[in-house]
Regions:
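Terminal accessory/targeting
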Residues: 1-87, 109-115, 121-132, 165, ...
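Metal-dependent polysaccharide deacetylase catalytic core of the NodB/CE4 family, i.e.
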Residues: 29-44, 64, 85-89, 97-203, ...
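A short glycine-rich beta-strand->turn/loop micro-motif centered on a GG-aromatic cluster
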Residues: 71, 117-119, 215-223
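Short histidine
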Residues: 147, 216, 221-256
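Catalytic-core region of carbohydrate-active enzymes that cleave or remodel glycosidic bonds
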Residues: 177, 182-186, 209-220
């Protein structure tokens, strides 16, 4: 009997030890968000992915062990400084096109993937033939979707004569009206905004922050606790960006650890003598090793451009020639020390003259 008692005691101790050393699910401190518009082979290629291509993306996420999680879950955890599952990805769509419902939703349901649709509400209210109906949106919400704000009319928000009090009041009224329509038709709606065309300025960002909104652009990169929560990036995954060979590198990347809140206003007003080309000054959150500094690379309008380091934490980059009118981006990557993956950051510019 004594031997049995000792055996049970030893077995219990071994069992507890095994639990303590057993591998646990890995966690991460960032999420990469994919951005889609149309799911169709018959719509403008620049903002479209065919149903077959979209199915290929979803299959790749599953095959490679990516954890597709609800955007709200990821945002809540990261804002609180907590971790998300390793290889976390969130799926978003802009514009509430009907082909998202007819072509995209069945594929998403095959994998039980949650997703978010940013809705511009006027086309829904006006029964636009290419937009979803309110019934479709309510159905999507019941089938794993989250609905969020994309303004009422999808108008340009910062291509205006000036950025005075009337402009800001009108812009916020537009956003508030869309929020009210979403809540009236579909119930509780998170205070998230996707900027039409990804365009914003720092005045609008600050106003949205004061009103409790989280906002998303269309520049690329991942989201972490240190991100600018009124200018969150997403990786475009349609059109020229739908190629899995390049998308897989972006999915494996991590947000570059910089002070995103200190980045300059993205609007370059030619009628107000703003500097063009603009200089992007960047402050890293940690001192970087020489190997990382030497391999930091930036691309501007498709051409490589070498940044200049002031010290171990600060660097700047500028185009060699004035940026053209419309949107441009400075995209930069750097190796993560001790890993095969890369840091990624992007800053969008809008060169505009009223």
């Amino acid at each position: 009997m004594l031997y049995l008692h000792q055996f049970l005691k030893l077995s219990t101790s071994l069992f507890i030890a095994l639990i303590l050393v057993a591998p646990t699910a890995q966690a991460a401190k960032h999420v990469n968000v994919l951005l889609y518009h149309h799911v169709s082979a018959d719509t403008p290629r620049s903002t479209s992915i065919s149903p077959d291509e979209f199915a290929g993306h979803m299959a790749y996420l599953q095959e490679q062990g990516y954890q597709v999680i609800a955007l709200g879950q990821a945002l809540s955890l990261l804002q609180a400084g907590e971790e998300v599952p390793d290889k976390s990805v969130a799926i978003t769509f802009d514009d509430a096109w009907r082909n998202i419902y007819t072509n995209g939703l069945p594929i998403l349901e095959q994998y039980n993937y949650p997703f978010t649709v940013f809705v511009n509400t006027d086309p829904i209210d006006q029964n636009h033939r290419m937009a979803m109906t309110w019934d479709m949106l309510r159905d999507m919400k019941q089938r794993g979707g989250t609905l969020a704000n994309h303004t009422t009319d999808h108008d340009y928000l910062v291509r205006k004569a000036d950025y005075g009090s009337q402009w800001l009041a009108d812009t916020l009224a537009n956003i508030d009206k869309a929020q009210q329509r979403l809540e009236a038709e579909t119930g509780a709606t998170p205070k998230w905004l996707a900027y039409p065309y990804g365009e914003y300025n720092n005045t609008l960002k600050q106003a949205l922050k004061e009103r409790g909104y989280i906002a998303f652009g269309q520049h690329s990169g991942g989201i972490a606790h240190f991100s600018d929560w009124q200018a969150l990036p997403r990786f475009p995954a349609a059109g020229m960006y739908s190629n899995l060979k390049t998308l897989k590198l972006k999915l494996a990347s991590q947000p570059m650890p910089i002070d995103y809140n200190a980045l300059p206003d993205p609007v370059i007003r030619l009628d107000q003598d703003h500097t063009n080309p603009p200089v992007l000054n960047v402050n890293m959150l940690t001192k970087e090793k020489k190997g990382v500094r030497d391999q930091l690379s930036c691309f501007i309008l498709g051409s490589p451009q070498k940044p200049v380091w002031q010290d171990q934490q600060n660097w700047h980059i500028s185009a060699e020639a004035p940026l053209p009118s419309e949107r441009s981006r400075y995209n930069c990557t750097a190796p993560i020390w001790g890993q095969k993956n890369y840091y990624w950051m992007s800053h969008q510019w809008l060169v505009y003259e009223h």
